[in-house]
Amino acid sequence: MTNIRKSHPLIKIVNSSLVDLPAPSNISSWWNFGSLLGVCLGIQILTGLFLAMHYTADTATAFNSVTHICRDVNYGWILRYLHANGASMFFICLYLHVGRGLYYGSYTLTETWNIGILLLFAVMATAFMGYVLPWGQMSFWGATVITNLLSAIPYVGTDLVEWIWGGFSVDKATLTRFFAFHFLLPFIIAAMVMVHLLFLHETGSNNPTGIPSDMDAIPFHPYYTIKDALGFLVMIMMLLTLVLFSPDLLGDPDNYTPANPLNTPPHIKPEWYFLFAYAILRSIPNKLGGVLALVLSILVLAIVPLLHTSKQRSMTFRPISQCLFWLLVANLLTLTWIGGQPVEHPYIIIGQLASILYFMIILVLMPLISIMENHLLKW
């Protein structure tokens, strides 16, 4: 009699994904972030579901309903801060996951990579709409500024913005629809994750050497289930430390002031995880140009597989490319810092230089250095 694990129509799908999946024997902790993102998504959906039971998506009561959750609902404060800081953990894991893909050449699995880019866009859209829901000052003005960017689209821009707003300004209709989409999108993301994994399991995982590991694979369980479990423990400990000791560390104090359309905050800025893109947007004086640069700052990832000129897949044995990669990381940290600064000298010029360098590294320097390394290795 065959094992139910291998014969049951549903269980065998789980078995082939989580138990008997052949995995490379040498994947490092950088491969933990995929499962950590799954945990983050689970935490966000669960905490979000319970928050939605007490939240009201109405301009008159939204801010007070969030206060009510924190003060009056049993353990409402921990739900709210787990959800807010869980988003930060989500993005930390996301950026490390994408960075891992860039460093080790995982982008050569093009279907998995492209679905990943779509997932990144979907998570960013969800996070943006979630930030609007507490209806504080930064929620309102962030929504106004970011949705207004669509007005830069020629001919249809203004109509498009008013269509999204549901009126002539960010108001009740906007808040209600943002809540609806913020609730819906995580489930669409969960479905996209399934497709992401489906494509990944078609080819199998990459590994730090970038060399096919078919001849040296080990079963996912127990080796990587226990390794993932340790990752979960570390991440949840970090999240709980943040939530229980300094829950407002990454938030904006302006969002503790109820939304007021008549009073603009001195510095409108998004959450920290969008600051690098916001800095790129602000570094271009033209509105349409800024919007295009903003979209391209993420969309540029889609052409990375086409720009892979090295004869090696991974950067493990390419020290010059490694230097360039870490320059890109430093550059992104610089952009994140600039995004949170006021628009004045010297921040403007630093932001412009960092923005140019960001696209230069990905589009020009990486492919050229890879060709040079091929020659140095006489390949």
From Swiss-Prot:
A Gene Ontology biological process term: mitochondrial electron transport, ubiquinol to cytochrome c
Top-rank taxon, per record: Eukaryota
Note describing how the cofactor binds: Binds 2 heme b groups non-covalently.
GO cellular component: mitochondrial inner membrane; respiratory chain complex III
Coiled-coil intervals: none
Binding site residues for heme b b562: 83, 182
PROSITE patterns: CYTB_CTER, CYTB_NTER
Membrane topology according to the record: Multi-pass membrane protein
Record field: transmembrane: 33-53, 77-98, 113-133, 178-198, 226-246, 288-308, 320-340, 347-367
Cell compartment(s), UniProt: Mitochondrion inner membrane
The protein's required cofactors: heme b
List of residues binding a ubiquinone: 201
UniProt KW keywords: Electron transport, Heme, Iron, Membrane, Metal-binding, Mitochondrion, Mitochondrion inner membrane, Respiratory chain, Transmembrane, Transmembrane helix, Transport, Ubiquinone
Major site of localization recorded for this protein: mitochondrion
Presence of the UniProt keyword Cell wall biogenesis/degradation in the record: no
InterPro entries noted in UniProt: Cyt_b/b6_C, Cyt_b/b6_C_sf, Cyt_b/b6_N, Cytb/b6-like_sf, Cytochrome_b, Cytochrome_b_C_euk/bac, Cytochrome_b_N_euk/bac, Di-haem_cyt_TM
Binding locations of heme b b566: 97, 196
Short name of one Pfam family: Cytochrome_B
Complexes and interactors: The cytochrome bc1 complex contains 11 subunits: 3 respiratory subunits (MT-CYB, CYC1 and UQCRFS1), 2 core proteins (UQCRC1 and UQCRC2) and 6 low-molecular weight proteins (UQCRH/QCR6, UQCRB/QCR7, UQCRQ/QCR8, UQCR10/QCR9, UQCR11/QCR10 and a cleavage product of UQCRFS1). This cytochrome bc1 complex then forms a dimer.
Additional record remark: Heme 1 (or BL or b562) is low-potential and absorbs at about 562 nm, and heme 2 (or BH or b566) is high-potential and absorbs at about 566 nm.
Function: Component of the ubiquinol-cytochrome c reductase complex (complex III or cytochrome b-c1 complex) that is part of the mitochondrial respiratory chain. The b-c1 complex mediates electron transfer from ubiquinol to cytochrome c. Contributes to the generation of a proton gradient across the mitochondrial membrane that is then used for ATP synthesis.
Family membership noted in the UniProt record: Belongs to the cytochrome b family.
Protein name: Cytochrome b
Classification lineage: Eukaryota, Metazoa, Chordata, Craniata, Vertebrata
